[in-house]
């Protein structure tokens, strides 16, 4: 005999409604949210008044590099101090010898770590250059397909070495987009490329040719970084790409004069520019709250995990929210609530999935049950993820993947 519901989550605290509800699910959709749902059901979860959240969004990762520092008593690569050039050089050495199977294994390990922590959506930037070729892209796309019932992965064909530094990058990016990458990305058009106009124009040319969005790394600080982001926003408008471009990192906002940002915010809003800051590297003076209050779309992300760029990381966005609040010295309930939005609804907007995201009737049943009373306490307590639901199916229970 058929049941009215495939799954009901009972006594779920929904922070957006500030009350406790039942959530009724059929297939992969939420079909009812009421104080008490009646009807027959195949499976039930009692949240016991604890917080139920939409799945977390990790809006900027590098899954093809993950776990490359592991396997020895001390983390590989980390006998030397960090510099950008050293990390790029170590990456080139790695990709020269890495196998398809090794990269794919690391991607799957990364994804499983994310899923255990309740992350159900991620965007990963995959190196494409004359050394890596499309080796990493092939491995990531294959893993993405195998992981589709656990996590949604967007893949950026990323010119890590620079379009104008590594002249094979353009043709290899084209090949990667032909293979099915979802976005195109570049890096530091000023200090890496030494050609702001040329690199941005090439990125838009590729994006428009393949009808994909753009996600651009801009680490540059000060006036150089602000200029690069402003030109990216201006070109977004000129190319008819409003709402389709993301700037990742944007460290320059942390040291730019406040009046510069005040002048630029209308441009960013007009262009629909999206931003991502990564909790492992967010500068302490990053004006996160100011940007959010101004209506700028700002997500949060883990960035690299245990590789030649960063020796640490575990793909846990709730831990990331705690790190972010501590780096920025945020303490109020309101501010912690805003940080929570960065790993949920703001991240969903960055990925362009907001129409199907959230706890509302008709939206996808991608949910996390936490051992916590609220988002604020979840961050403070580092709450356990009691249950993770993807497409209406329980995929994690008691911190074990069961799907």
From Swiss-Prot:
Q: What GO molecular functions are on record for this protein?
A: hydrolase activity, acting on carbon-nitrogen (but not peptide) bonds, in cyclic amidines; metal ion binding; N-isopropylammelide isopropylaminohydrolase activity
- Give the enzyme's main class according to its UniProt record, as a single word: hydrolase
Result of altering residue 303 to A/N: Almost no effect
Q: Which residues form the active site?
A: 249 (proton donor/acceptor)
Keyword Zinc assigned to the entry: answer is: yes
Please convey what the UniProt record notes about how activity depends on pH.
Optimum pH is 7.25.
Q: How is the cofactor bound?
A: Binds 1 Zn(2+) ion per subunit.
Q: Which reaction does it catalyse?
A: N-isopropylammelide + H2O + H(+) = isopropylamine + cyanurate
Cite the effect that the entry attributes to residue 219 to A.
Almost no effect
Q: Which GO terms describe its cellular component?
A: cytoplasm
User: What does the UniProt function comment say about this protein?
Assistant: Transforms N-isopropylammelide to cyanuric acid and isopropylamine.
Family of this protein? Belongs to the metallo-dependent hydrolases superfamily. N-acyl-D-amino-acid deacylase family.
Protein name, UniProt field: N-isopropylammelide isopropyl amidohydrolase
What species was this sequence derived from?
A: Pseudomonas sp. (strain ADP)
Gene that this sequence comes from: atzC
